[in-house]
């Protein structure tokens, strides 16, 4: 058994518009499921919540104020996780999220 940590940055998981890259997320989840089936552990560390939130909130530019960034992140996080959860569930893998802050 091996343990993998996969870091996916915003530019990997989302277009500049904030739209999620379904093809990339699908391939990642396919690989996670294959490794899970072999008994490996996989942790996905993902960015993209702000980008997704910006699209949902129809923000034309990335916010600069911390409060606006937090709002976009809060809106986008659940929607981003839902995509991972659905893709992994379709492949027989249970997912969970852990939210970290600067102090973690």
Describe these PLM feature segments.
Residues 1-104:
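Nucleotide/pyrophosphate-binding catalytic subdomain
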